[in-house]
Amino acid sequence: MAGHSKWANIQHRKGRVDAQRGKMWSKLSKAIIVSAKMGGGDPSLNIRLRKAIDDAKAVSMPKDNIERAIKRGTGELDGDAVEEVLYEGYGPGGVAVMCLALTDNRNRTAPELRTMFGKFGGELGKTGCVSYLFERKGIFVFGEGADEEKVTELALENGADDVEVDEDGKVQVTCSPEAFSDLEVAFDEAGMDTEVSEVTQIASTNVDLDESVSGKVLALLEALDDHDDIQTVSTNANFPSESVSE
């Protein structure tokens, strides 16, 4: 899981800067729309929607924007349909990359991602080209200084598969997608804040990168992460510590 943990840490630091610029509003609006469409417009009954709303509030997204997104998801307001699409490809050095997009226009998103992959030395592939290298997992990352014993106890009581502490002292919990909601509720009720909380694609095995390639891979991943339609980016790349600390 080390490769995912390092990339997740980079995303978390970068996300704080993005939030200050308001760049997350478009992404979060789509997340709210899809969450409301899948589970209804009541956040007290729809944990995924509640998390999307909390994320939106954390970056000062206006209340009216949030309410409009919910109503688009429930069908109370008209708008282009937003759907989840999983894109797969290869980065520099042949590393595997998977991107979860929320898009209202596949004919726009796919060409843009194809161009982006090519610009950074990669290639957008066909469905199934790298997905066999990943498993769909829930993941929670707690910052340095988190109570490892308390995290572990709650995690194991609520269906987690594994608890690890990475080299930066961060506690990482992984679980099946089915156990994600129970764990999310347990951590929330215990007042335990997470740096990362999502269901994503986790590589079964990681590919170690040297410095000559890691910078190119990071440039691609960060560009993909910046795209308005992309919600999560996963890779099987394992970055040198020097790359993560930059």
UniProtKB/Swiss-Prot annotation:
GO CC term, one of those recorded: cytosol
Alphabetical list of InterPro entries matching this protein: Integrase-like_N, TACO1_YebC-like_2nd/3rd_dom, TACO1_YebC_N, Transcrip_reg_TACO1-like, Transcrip_reg_TACO1-like_dom3, YebC-like
Transmembrane portions of the chain: none
Record flagged with keyword Transcription: yes
Subcellular location: Cytoplasm
Keyword tags: Cytoplasm, DNA-binding, Transcription, Transcription regulation
Gene Ontology molecular function: DNA binding
Gene Ontology terms: biological process: regulation of DNA-templated transcription
Pfam families, alphabetized: TACO1_YebC_N, Transcrip_reg
Family the UniProt entry places it in: Belongs to the TACO1 family.
PANTHER family: TRANSCRIPTIONAL REGULATORY PROTEIN YEBC-RELATED, TRANSLATIONAL ACTIVATOR OF CYTOCHROME C OXIDASE 1
Protein name listed in UniProt: Probable transcriptional regulatory protein RB5500
Organism encoding this protein: Rhodopirellula baltica (strain DSM 10527 / NCIMB 13988 / SH1)
Lineage, broadest ranks: Bacteria, Pseudomonadati, Planctomycetota, Planctomycetia, Pirellulales
